[in-house]
Curated annotation (Swiss-Prot):
Stated family: Belongs to the amino acid-polyamine-organocation (APC) superfamily. Basic amino acid/polyamine antiporter (APA) (TC 2.A.3.2) family.
The organism's taxonomic lineage, starting at the top: Bacteria, Pseudomonadati, Pseudomonadota, Gammaproteobacteria, Enterobacterales
The species this protein was found in: Escherichia coli (strain K12)
Record-given protein name: Arginine/agmatine antiporter
pH-linked activity: Optimum pH is 2.5 for Arg-Agm exchange.
Site positions for Cytoplasmic (distal) gate: Y93, E208, Y365
Family annotation (InterPro entries): AA/rel_permease1, APC_superfamily
Effect of S357A: 20% decreased affinity for Arg, 40% decrease affinity for Agm
Localization terms from the record: Cell inner membrane
Periplasmic side: 25-40, 114-123, 172-188, 248-272, 344-346, 405-408
Length: 445
């Protein structure tokens, strides 16, 4: 059983591409248009964001070295703060993984409507999305090697237009176009940078991917830290070079209303055929990242089920070590949410749910930063000041992202935390049939 499972584990390059693919996902293709409302000054926002994202990646890299247990943030929170915060972390992250997939598949299939206009019909779009979601559930059931190979190909395809614009877009870059829209936000310098951060801070969600999937990675103590930092660096370079190039290619007024900035830039430079290729690559990038996020949903639930914090069904695995039942449950839940979003009234509510689910990932990030301070105590050696600085930067990065969120999103995130508290109590009672030990001594640690 163990040797069969080891044979299905993945190496450094596929897991690095999974990290970068999960980070960039679908958002990279809309970033230039989103940042156009601020202008070229967004470059400063990128610099701040990249510092924070690298800090967070270093936190996860060090944590995965100190504790290579599968589950990522869940494993760290449970070890350092006990089963309650471990349970809370896992539920939040598990929800974020599969809810985010629903928004991502809509964007990916939407890009395919460039080739198949029938996909613009809401019913056809929804049915296609459900089919695509199940394809990636089934690919995950085949095994982690299969899904990381698929995502590696998808990430490479997605990188074609991104790297193409990042490298060759500069031949069509015009400094006057870029500087003419240096700051069109109507805010001062600090305010403009803050408005940029509200967009860019979210662009590195997924930095934890390798640590969550440590259970299916070869030599996780070595490969997970390298893949984490490497994936962030790949995403950072692609983000900055490509978005900056496009902001100097397309006039700000046109860029603000662009539904496909990369496609528009490619058409401007090389014609309609190039635009079609970019649309295909964008669809591949969006849909390919579904595989990685579905993998994480299955692995984080399995890690919690192995510890008794999730129902045992999530821990059932096949010969390849794949949590088949847990993945099928995720597939059913994604199908229900996808079908419910077909209603125009439900679409708005689902948009709120998607935004809240992104905040769900920030709570595990914060717990991981705190866990490093605890678990790393006495293990940093002479690098202690450096790690304290890095952890502080990562912590502030997460706090700033929460502050930049909408009030309604933060409120519903807090409500979810309260519901999870009650769920933990019910789960505890399910696992422990004896009365709660009222005379248990209070720990003085």
């Amino acid at each position: 059983m163990s040797s069969d499972a080891d044979a299905h584990k993945v190496g450094l390059i596929p897991v690095t591409l999974m990290v970068s693919g999960n980070i960039m996902g679908s958002g990279v293709f809309l970033l230039p248009a989103n940042l156009a409302s601020t202008g070229g000054i967004a470059i400063y926002g990128w610099l701040v964001t990249i510092i924070g994202a690298l800090g967070l990646s270093m936190v996860y890299a060090k944590m995965s070295f100190l504790d290579p247990s599968p589950g990522g943030s869940y494993a760290y929170a449970r070890r350092c703060f006990g089963p309650f915060l471990g349970y809370q972390t896992n539920v939040l992250y598990w929800l974020a993984c599969w809810i985010g997939n629903i928004a991502m598949v809509v964007i990916g299939v939407g890009y395919l409507s460039y080739f198949f206009p029938i996909l613009k019909d809401p019913l056809v779009l929804t049915i296609t999305c459900v089919v695509v979601l199940w394809i990636f559930v089934l690919l995950n059931i085949v095994g982690p090697k299969m899904i990381t190979r698929v995502q590696a190909v998808a990430t490479v395809l997605a990188l074609i237009p991104i790297v193409g614009i990042a490298v060759f877009g500069w031949f069509w870059f015009r400094g006057e176009t870029y500087m003419a829209a240096w700051n069109v936000s109507g805010l001062g310098t600090f305010g403009a940078i803050q408005s940029t951060l509200n967009v860019t801070l979210w662009s590195f969600i997924g930095v934890e991917s390798a640590s969550v999937a440590a259970g299916v990675v070869k030599n996780p103590k070595r490969n997970v830290p390298i893949a984490t930092i490497g994936g962030v660096l790949i995403a950072a370079v692609c983000y900055v070079l490509s978005t900056t190039a496009i902001m100097g290619m397309i006039p700000n007024a046109a860029l603000r209303v662009s539904a496909s900035p990369f496609g528009d830039a490619a058409r401007m430079a090389l014609g309609d055929t190039a635009g079609a290729i970019v649309s295909f690559c964008a669809a591949a990038g969006c849909l390919g990242s579904l595989g990685g996020w579905t993998l994480l949903a299955g692995q984080t639930a399995k890690a919690a089920a192995d510890d008794g914090l999730f129902p045992p069904i999530f821990a059932r695995v096949n010969k390849a070590g794949t949590p088949v039942a847990g993945l099928i449950i995720v597939g059913i839940l994604m199908t229900i949410f996808q079908l419910s979003s077909i209603s125009p009234n439900a679409t708005k509510e689902f948009g709120l749910v998607s935004s809240v689910s992104v905040i769900f990932t920030l709570v595990p990030y914060l717990y991981t930063c705190a866990a490093l301070l605890l678990l790393g105590h006495g293990h940093f050696g002479k690098a202690r000041p450096a790690y304290l600085a890095v952890t502080t930067i990562a912590f502030l990065y997460c706090i700033w992202a929460v502050v930049g969120s909408g009030a309604k999103e933060v409120m519903w995130s807090f409500v979810t935390l309260m519901v999870i508290t009650a769920m933990y109590a019910l789960n505890y009672n399910r696992l422990h049939k004896n009365p709660y030990p009222l005379d248990a001594p209070i720990s003085k640690d």
